């Protein structure tokens, strides 16, 4: 049956994207490109965005089918809440951007507050309905050390979900980059889930994986559609949630290493400019730095995918040992 769920997720996305693209074009829901960005990106102006709606809809439909036919699918209900919650924040952000015809959507404060709200509701639902057995301790990779957080674990959950939601969002700046890295990441978490005996979470990861495989052909260079914040914020939130539900939180540092590096590059760039007036990179996130030193977009994407695959395998090894 897992094969059926995977095929359903793949087909729904693959069919929906070519239906959605002309609709988005007709509604003029095109991406605005930063003027200070690489000049090679200016030709992407007007490319339809909000494509994440397709794979999110695929995930929701397929997951509902699983919930109907699979016993003990409660973890999937919780993951669906996170998917829809973070996806809705991204959708609102995208909608404001395309209506205003600029690259500014929700304010940072509005976005953070909404994300924090989803994270807190996730924790409350998990506890009230006993859907997650929180360890409240963080296990340090390669050691037998576990750091007890007690009530501070709630703060960690909020930080983890909000942080990775925005990390994937920052990474989604090149054609196919975030999609490919997410495919790698969900592959690792699918394997980890089945090894750890978390079948429902494993099935959800398979659904994520194949829904994104249906989206990738339309998103690789030259992209016919972008996932937008609708997709990227949801993906990051889901990654963090899965790592929490598996009690393998720090495995995400490796499985999502490229997302972490991209985020750190932005933080370092901002800090350096504020403190010294100088920039460390030609542009951040760091994928733009490599473009500006002469790498083609496709080279940056494939190298980052390779890094994501290697670090993802390390994260998988950490999670199953």
Curated annotation (Swiss-Prot):
User: Listed GO molecular functions?
Assistant: metal ion binding; phospho-N-acetylmuramoyl-pentapeptide-transferase activity
Chief location bin = membrane
Q: Pathway it acts in? A: Cell wall biogenesis; peptidoglycan biosynthesis
Enzyme Commission number, as recorded: 2.7.8.13
The reaction(s) catalysed by this protein are: UDP-N-acetyl-alpha-D-muramoyl-L-alanyl-gamma-D-glutamyl-L-lysyl-D-alanyl-D-alanine + di-trans,octa-cis-undecaprenyl phosphate = Mur2Ac(oyl-L-Ala-gamma-D-Glu-L-Lys-D-Ala-D-Ala)-di-trans,octa-cis-undecaprenyl diphosphate + UMP
Where do transmembrane segments lie in this chain? Answer: 1-21, 50-70, 76-96, 112-132, 140-160, 176-196, 200-220, 225-245, 250-270, 300-320
User: Which membrane topology describes this protein?
Assistant: Multi-pass membrane protein
Give the GO cellular component terms, alphabetically: plasma membrane
Q: Which GO terms describe its biological process?
A: cell division; cell wall organization; peptidoglycan biosynthetic process; regulation of cell shape
This protein's UniProt keywords: Cell cycle, Cell division, Cell membrane, Cell shape, Cell wall biogenesis/degradation, Magnesium, Membrane, Metal-binding, Peptidoglycan synthesis, Transferase, Transmembrane, Transmembrane helix
Could you tell me where this protein is found in the cell?
Answer: Cell membrane
Q: Does the keyword Transmembrane helix apply?
A: yes
Essential cofactor(s): Mg(2+)
First-level EC class: transferase
PANTHER family associated with the record: PHOSPHO-N-ACETYLMURAMOYL-PENTAPEPTIDE-TRANSFERASE (PTHR22926), PHOSPHO-N-ACETYLMURAMOYL-PENTAPEPTIDE-TRANSFERASE HOMOLOG (PTHR22926:SF5)
The task this protein performs is described as: Catalyzes the initial step of the lipid cycle reactions in the biosynthesis of the cell wall peptidoglycan: transfers peptidoglycan precursor phospho-MurNAc-pentapeptide from UDP-MurNAc-pentapeptide onto the lipid carrier undecaprenyl phosphate, yielding undecaprenyl-pyrophosphoryl-MurNAc-pentapeptide, known as lipid I.
Protein family per UniProt: Belongs to the glycosyltransferase 4 family. MraY subfamily.
**Can you name this protein?**
Phospho-N-acetylmuramoyl-pentapeptide-transferase
């Amino acid at each position: 049956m897992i094969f059926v769920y995977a095929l359903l997720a793949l087909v729904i996305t693959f069919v929906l994207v070519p239906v959605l693209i002309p609709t988005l074009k007709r509604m003029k829901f095109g991406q605005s490109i930063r003027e200070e960005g690489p000049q090679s990106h200016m030709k992407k102006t007007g490319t339809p965005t909000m494509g994440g709606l397709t794979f999110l809809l695929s995930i929701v439909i397929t997951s509902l089918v699983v919930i109907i036919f699979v016993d003990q699918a409660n973890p999937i209900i919780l993951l669906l809440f996170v998917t829809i919650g973070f996806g809705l924040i991204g959708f609102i952000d995208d909608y404001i951007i395309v209506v205003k015809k600029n690259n500014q959507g929700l304010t940072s404060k509005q976005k953070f507050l909404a994300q924090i709200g989803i994270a807190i509701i996730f924790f409350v639902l998990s506890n009230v309905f006993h859907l997650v057995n929180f360890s409240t301790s963080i296990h340090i990779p390669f050691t037998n050390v576990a750091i007890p957080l007690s009530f501070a674990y709630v703060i960690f959950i909020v930080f983890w979900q909000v942080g990775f939601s925005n990390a994937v969002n920052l990474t989604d700046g090149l054609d196919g980059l975030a999609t490919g890295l997410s495919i790698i990441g969900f592959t690792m978490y699918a394997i980890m889930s089945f090894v750890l005996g978390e079948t429902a979470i494993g099935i959800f990861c398979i659904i994520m994986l194949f829904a994104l495989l249906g989206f990738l052909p339309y998103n690789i260079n030259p992209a016919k559609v972008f996932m937008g914040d609708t997709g990227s914020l949801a993906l990051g939130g889901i990654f963090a949630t899965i790592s929490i539900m598996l009690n393998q939180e720090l495995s995400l540092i490796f499985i999502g290493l490229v997302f972490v590096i991209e985020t750190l590059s932005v933080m370092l760039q901002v800090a350096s400019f504020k403190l010294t007036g100088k920039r460390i990179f030609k542009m951040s996130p760091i994928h733009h730095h490599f473009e500006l030193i002469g790498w083609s977009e496709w080279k940056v994407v494939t190298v980052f995918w390779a890094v994501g695959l290697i670090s993802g395998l390390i994260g998988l090894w950490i999670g199953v040992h």
